[in-house]
Every structure is written in C-alpha cells, then in structure tokens.
Amino acid sequence: MLQIFILAAVAIFLFWRLRAVLGSRDGFEKNIKDINASKKVIKSPDIIEEPSKVNPHDDIFDYVEENSKSAEVFKKMKEFDSDFSVNKFVSGAKMAYEMILMAFENGDTEKLGPLLEHKVLKSFTSVIEKRKKEGLVIEAKFIGMRDIRIIDASFSEKTKVADITLSFKSEISTVVKDAEGSIIEGHPDEIKKQKDTWVFTKDLSEKSPIWLLKSTL
C-alpha cells in the first residue's frame, strides 16, 4: 500500500515538472496566435488601383500595321465618326461577302440591289441575265471563310467618302446545270477555293450603316 502512494507521489511530481518545462496546451495555442498576429501584413489604407487605359485604336492595329497609311486613314475615320469600328466593319464585310457571292451565283438580283453600287449591280445583273438566256442554272453553297484581310483604305475629308479594299479567301461548292437539269460543270461534293478582292464604299456623313460594294478587282 505504501508503495502505491510513493508511485503516485512520483507521478504527480513528474507531471508538474513536465508542465513547468513544456507549458500548457492553452499557452501553446496562445503563443501560435501571437506569432501569426505578428506575421500579418499591414496594408496601406485608401489605395485605389487605377484601371488600365484602353487604346481607342486597338481595333485598327488588329488588322493593319501601326504606322501604315491605312492606320492613319482609319484614325481619321474614327475622328470624324466616333461610331466607326474596324472590327465591326470587317465583321459586316464578311457577312456581306457571303450574301453577295451567293446571291450572284444563284441569280438573286433582289438581294443584290441594296448591297451594290449602281455600276456593280448593272454588271452583275448583266451576267445573271445572260446565264438565264442560255438556260444555265447555278446551284452554289458557301462552305466557309478561310481568310479576310484589309488591303487598303482611303478617306476624303472633303466629301467624307471612305473606301476600304479587302481580300477574301473562301470555299464554295458550285454546280452548273443546263435547261434540262443535267450537270455540265462541277460536282455537289466538290469544294473550290475562291479568292476575291473587293472595294467597299460609304459616305460617313450619312446615318445608314450599310457599306456598298463599289468594285471587284
């Protein structure tokens, strides 16, 4: 019995010695918090980050060289017409190209009318009428656009008329049939590569957003 009391007394003595050396768990956690608090980064108040400035001519440089003649022309266009955007123009020209090309191939003069200048419309209509007289029918399908690039641009500060020349590379499928419906040229599954250079024109002083096809080169 005496031996048990002695062992118990030794155990209590060792416990208190360890507590004195190592410290309590609560004290350890408190020290960690103090250390973490000392590591906190002090941020300067009232610092506002200014948003990066956007270059109003970025859309120009997406398509032409920064110091090129065309770049200077586009800057003048934007100075006169703040709504003008090279990105929007190219996007619209892409759609117009497909519409005009397919309308011409399929002989749809009604669709061509609002998109062409008078001289070009007259030329296109003449070719379409000639095909009809010969009994030829063209069935065309637009496959897709491979490339579109701005070749040149001009703007008259006097007349406010702008001309933009673009190069198009596309893929189409065309079949030519005679009056009896027999295929005399092409194949429905044959895809041809098409390359065109077109000039679009617009009076920037007018409210109409439509650019007309001025010529084909």
Regions found by a protein language model. Give the residues of each.
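Polynucleotide-recognition surfaces of large bacterial nucleic-acid defense/processing enzymes
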Residues: A11
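Structured, amphipathic secondary-structure segments that form assembly/contact surfaces
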Residues: K111-L217
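Short alpha-helical basic/polar micro-motif
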Residues: Q3, W16, E110, W198
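Feature marks short, highly hydrophobic, charge-poor N-terminal signal-anchor/signal peptide-like helices
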Residues: M1-A8
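Juxtamembrane and targeting peptides
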Residues: F5, L14, R19-M95, V176-E180
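Core segments of small alpha/beta cavity-forming domains
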Residues: N55-I143
